[in-house]
Amino acid sequence: MRSAQVYRWQIPMDAGVVLRDRRLKTRDGLYVCLREGEREGWGEISPLPGFSQETWEEAQSVLLAWVNNWLAGDCELPQMPSVAFGVSCALAELADTLPQAANYRAAPLCNGDPDDLILKLADMPGEKVAKVKVGLYEAVRDGMVVNLLLEAIPDLHLRLDANRAWTPLKGQQFAKYVNPDYRHRIAFLEEPCKTRDDSRAFARETGIAIAWDESLREPDFAFVAEEGVRAVVIKPTLTGSLEKVREQVQAAHALGLTAVISSSIESSLGLTQLARIAAWLTPDTIPGLDTLDLMQAQQVRRWPGSTLPVVEVDALERLL
């Protein structure tokens, strides 16, 4: 006997969260809970404004239609990426095919203060990895901050994300302020320039490795080994079903590329599932999941070690 619930939710964000020049005041999304006999599975559907092609209202419409079809015995996955991902997670939990083991070692997001980062890294076992957003301020400032961090913490490796913010000139201005002796400790820089060709040129000219992120979701993208390209950053909420995520990870690994499972600012429920996916598909790589502290609450499932208050399922708005 099948049953299902769909919940709508909204979490207040910290004041300083800006995405693509838009201030994100709340994180809005949906949960689906599928039950069959004694088993149940949960999934999160939370399109990311400015990044997802669909709105959460559109996702809600597709999700409710899919749930009604599933209750009638149809299991075909929807095409909309955020819905496909959430539904496939719920089905995987229901079938017990999403392993419970999780990788909660998130690469901490750094605001540029080395003292703050040293404290965060002190408790991190093994490899010291942190992430810095660049491209929000002047490229020269970004270069100076990155250089300062690498100089202050000799065993640090940085992941940088520019979200295609730079022209070739700005990319050169950034690199000019990063000591060439430190550049090998930049694990990768995600999408430095507005075009892939400019990003490839940046990697060749600076010796700083790059990673593809937005490019993975463009119709002309193909997985190929390229000089200067070291990694792909996979955001499942923007990608689609668990199977599609797994295919992308396998394609990257086959070329010797690092695959990083990364957050699209999901709630704690979605983040804990991403931690499980990371442990399953990319066990040797620290995922990019350090986004929970951008929110003012957790929901339904806790992230280990977080002190944020938890909103239980009874407090959510039920749609079905």
UniProtKB/Swiss-Prot annotation:
Enzyme type, top EC level: lyase
Reaction(s) this enzyme catalyzes, per UniProt: (1R,6R)-6-hydroxy-2-succinyl-cyclohexa-2,4-diene-1-carboxylate = 2-succinylbenzoate + H2O
Binding site for Mg(2+): D161, E190, D213
EC number: 4.2.1.113
Protein keywords: Lyase, Magnesium, Menaquinone biosynthesis, Metal-binding
UniProt keyword Magnesium present: yes
Active site: K133, K235
Keyword Iron listed: no
Transmembrane spans: none
A single GO molecular function term of this UniProt record: magnesium ion binding
Domain of life of the native organism: Bacteria
Name of the protein this chain belongs to: o-succinylbenzoate synthase
Protein species of origin: Escherichia coli O139:H28 (strain E24377A / ETEC)
Lineage: Bacteria, Pseudomonadati, Pseudomonadota, Gammaproteobacteria, Enterobacterales
Gene symbol of the encoding locus: menC
